[in-house]
């Protein structure tokens, strides 16, 4: 019996052809899918490369920018310059001290010195300009020194020295004449509209000469600041490290003097500084190792690294171990020019804390003249009230009065102690601001802070020089004990 055999039906020609066509179609589809997959893979690869570049390359640029900032801020705080520091004053005509009293070089002479030595540039940050007596419409002989300074400035362009002036908007045509003369001589002048930018004024008073020498202090560009107003400042010679740091503040004013200027936030890195209260510059001043930095106000004008002026003052008060001596024209724990009125107790609180918690000896020598605000004496009386034989809180307040003849009394905005400094057992602070809230919140100011306590055994430090000036004035016949509010007007008149 034959075995059962399964037979397959033989496909027809058409059926075979269909199978071939179907096979080729499948292959075509496969090739199409393959090509699509390759294209998709390429696109994904490209997208990955773009993403990688964003993750790797762009942060690299960011890191480069950040590194630039860090280089500026981590710059070596050691300065190799051998700087010469000179404490300078203007003593008003008719104000005479005892024969053995401390006397410092004049601001007029120091200004003349750095002007005559200028080789390439003079940059001046200023509140206003009245170096001639045209603003008073008089022929006051004591204006001669101011007129000499203005003439030296007008001659600088002829010597190939560039002059830049940053100034607050003039408040009267009479205060614009010096500015016009400077422009006519070839000086570059920019009006910094801080009233618009910060609701304050450009109250700073400093010079930078050849990026090597500088002056900073209380004296305005005013003939009275040389002969009719008591002023104090510092002139530093051969000190490019500090001069260049102060110049950064000037450059900030300069850029804000452009038309339609706005406040940068943050400031570009080239305005930053590595020198501040935490990392002061290590520099030799008068052959003495010193820690120095420059503070600034208001905060919106301070670039990265710059200590705000208020923070500097508070830090110095808190750092004092034995005494805090303050000599300023105005002192008030308020915002004097705000509407509505605002209480502003920051400095006041730290003074009280120093007296109460650390038994620090605090003395305030405040100016008293015809433009003094009556409210100031209310707050001064509050501070003075802390001192008594029972409390043993060591705080004293005196007022300083510059004498005036009948002729001198007719000179407007003169015959006043315009100083703006503080000295402790550790630090010397020389500033440009009055001590009320407005000057630290809205108004542009700056200060030089010097600490030489590391130089053990050094005689005649800058701190000692400033202390000697304070004690001379405190013990002089022009200083009067502050007792009651009712008597302050009588005490302000000689």
UniProtKB/Swiss-Prot annotation:
Using the UniProt annotation, give the residues that carry a glycan (glycosylation sites).
100, 238, 260, 270, 286, 389, 434, 451, 477
Write the record's keywords in alphabetical order, separated by commas. Answer: Endoplasmic reticulum, Endosome, Exonuclease, Glycoprotein, Golgi apparatus, Hydrolase, Immunity, Inflammatory response, Lysosome, Membrane, Nuclease, Repeat, Signal-anchor, Transmembrane, Transmembrane helix, Ubl conjugation
The question of whether Repeat is a record keyword is answered with: yes
Q: Which InterPro entries match?
A: Diverse_PLD-related, PLDc_3, PLipase_D/transphosphatidylase
Q: Which residues form the signal peptide?
A: none
Which EC class, in a word?
hydrolase
MF annotations from Gene Ontology = single-stranded DNA 5'-3' DNA exonuclease activity
Question: Where does it sit, as one GO cellular component term?
Answer: early endosome membrane
Enzyme Commission code: 3.1.16.1
Q: Which domain of life is it from?
A: Eukaryota
Q: How does it sit in the membrane?
A: Single-pass type II membrane protein
Ranges for domain PLD phosphodiesterase: 198-225, 413-439
Q: Which reaction does it catalyse?
A: Exonucleolytic cleavage in the 5'- to 3'-direction to yield nucleoside 3'-phosphates
**Cited function:** 5'->3' DNA exonuclease which digests single-stranded DNA (ssDNA). Regulates inflammatory cytokine responses via the degradation of nucleic acids, by reducing the concentration of ssDNA able to stimulate TLR9, a nucleotide-sensing receptor in collaboration with PLD4. May be important in myotube formation. Plays a role in lysosomal homeostasis. Involved in the regulation of endosomal protein sorting.
Active-site positions on this chain: 203, 205, 210, 418, 420, 425
Instruction: List the source organism.
Output: Xenopus tropicalis (Western clawed frog)
Entry comment on modification after translation? N-glycosylated. Proteolytically processed to a soluble form that is stable within endosomes and lysosomes. During transport through the secretory pathway becomes proteolysed by cysteine proteases, thereby releasing a stable soluble lysosomal lumenal polypeptide, whereas the transmembrane-bound fragment is rapidly degraded. Its transport route to lysosomes involves ubiquitination and the ESCRT complex.
Q: What is this protein called?
A: 5'-3' exonuclease PLD3
Recorded family membership: Belongs to the phospholipase D family.
Looking at the UniProt entry, the stretches that span the membrane are 38-58
Q: Which residues lie on this side of the membrane: Lumenal?
A: 59-494
């Amino acid at each position: 019996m034959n075995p059962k055999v399964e037979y397959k039906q033989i496909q027809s020609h058409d059926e075979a052809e269909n199978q071939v066509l179907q096979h080729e179609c499948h292959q075509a589809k496969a090739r199409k899918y393959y090509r699509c997959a390759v294209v998709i893979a390429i696109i994904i690869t490209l997208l990955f490369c773009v993403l990688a570049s964003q993750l790797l390359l762009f942060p690299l640029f960011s890191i480069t920018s950040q590194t630039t900032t860090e280089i500026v801020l981590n710059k070596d705080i050691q300065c190799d310059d051998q700087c010469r520091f000179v404490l300078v004053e203007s003593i008003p005509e008719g104000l005479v001290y005892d024969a053995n009293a401390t006397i410092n070089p004049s601001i007029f002479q120091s200004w003349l010195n750095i002007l005559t030595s200028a080789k390439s540039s003079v940059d001046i940050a200023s509140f206003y300009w009245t170096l001639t007596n045209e603003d008073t419409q008089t022929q006051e002989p004591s204006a001669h020194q101011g007129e000499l300074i203005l003439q030296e400035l007008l001659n600088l362009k002829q010597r190939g020295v560039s002059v830049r002036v940053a100034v607050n908007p003039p408040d009267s045509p009479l205060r614009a004449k010096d500015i016009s003369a400077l422009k006519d001589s070839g000086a570059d002048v920019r009006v910094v509209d801080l009233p618009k930018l910060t609701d304050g004024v450009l109250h700073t008073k400093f010079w930078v000469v050849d990026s090597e020498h500088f002056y900073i202090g209380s004296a305005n560009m005013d003939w009275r600041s040389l002969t009719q107003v008591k002023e104090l400042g510092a002139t530093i010679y051969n000190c490019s490290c500090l001069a260049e740091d102060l110049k950064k503040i000037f450059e900030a004013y300069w850029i804000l003097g452009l038309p339609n200027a706005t406040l940068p936030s943050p400031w570009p890195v080239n305005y930053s500084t590595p020198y501040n209260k935490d990392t002061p510059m290590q520099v030799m001043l008068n052959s003495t190792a010193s820690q120095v930095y420059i503070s600034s106000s208001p905060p919106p004008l301070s670039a990265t690294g710059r200590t705000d002026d208020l923070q500097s003052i508070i830090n110095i008060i808190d750092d004092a171990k034995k005494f805090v001596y303050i000599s300023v024209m105005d002192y008030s724990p308020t915002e004097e020019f705000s509407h509505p009125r605002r209480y502003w107790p920051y400095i006041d609180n730290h003074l009280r804390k120093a007296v109460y918690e650390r038994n620090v000896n605090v003395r305030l020598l405040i100016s008293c003249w015809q433009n003094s605000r009556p409210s100031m004496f209310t707050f001064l009386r509050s501070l003075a009230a802390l001192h008594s034989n029972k409390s043993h809180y060591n705080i004293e307040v005196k007022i300083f009065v510059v004498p005036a003849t009948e002729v001198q009394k007719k000179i407007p905005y003169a015959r006043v102690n315009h100083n703006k400094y503080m000295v402790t057992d550790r630090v010397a602070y020389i500033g440009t601001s009055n001590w009320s809230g407005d000057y630290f919140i809205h108004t542009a100011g700056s200060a030089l802070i010097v600490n030489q306590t590391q130089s053990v055994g050094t005689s005649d430090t800058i701190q000692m020089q400033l202390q000697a000036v304070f004690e001379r004035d405190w013990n002089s016949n022009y200083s009067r004990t502050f007792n009651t509010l009712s008597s302050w007007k009588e005490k302000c008149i000689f």
